[in-house]
Amino acid sequence: MKKLSVLIGTVAALAMPFTANAQSFSGNANGSAGEANLEQSINVTCDVTFDGTVTSSTTVAISSPDIAPGDFSCLFVVPQGTWSAATVSGDATKIDITMGANTVANDPCYGTVRGDWDNSAKVLTITNKTLPPIDPNGATCTIHSATISIPNLNLS
């Protein structure tokens, strides 16, 4: 009888719904702006702006990314590839950003980096992350620091 009670208790526990630990975007990424310090052949600090649409609860399609002069050399740095953002399962303080840039050295980098998200301040911070070169013989790009305000995006 004791084994039957344990078995029934186990079955009842397994039948209970599990709480999903999925993170979810809402709002949009329109009006996002900040600056990024990027290094490949030289170190530059550029202004970054973009808009974006939440395309699913876990993805933001970033549109109209723009890299503008903070430093004069930023005139030669342009966005590369399709940019997007994705939730990190189980962690509402992290966002994966897929992005790229063609650099001053004309050696583009593109990839995904993980940033820290402050949902109260609506700020994404990226520190000391690398983007791989598109050309296998190219040089990596290092994002020493980036701080981007995304005022209309929520992550819960």
List the model feature ranges, each with a label:
Residues 111-156:
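A charged, solvent-exposed segment within the mature domains of Sec-exported extracytoplasmic proteins
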Residues 22, 29-31, 92, 119-120, ...:
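Short linear motifs in intrinsically disordered/low-complexity regions
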Residues 1-21:
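Gram-negative bacterial Sec-dependent N-terminal signal peptides
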Residues 18-69, 80, 139-156:
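N-terminal segment immediately downstream of the Sec signal-peptide cleavage site
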Residues 29-35, 95-99, 125-126:
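Short, hydrophobic/proline-enriched secondary-structure or compact coil segments at domain edges
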Residues 47-121:
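Predominantly extracellular/secreted and cell-surface proteins with exposed
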Residues 13, 31, 35-38, 85, ...:
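Intrinsically disordered, low-complexity, compositionally biased regions/tails
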Residues 5, 23, 27-30, 77, ...:
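Compositionally biased, low-complexity repeat tracts
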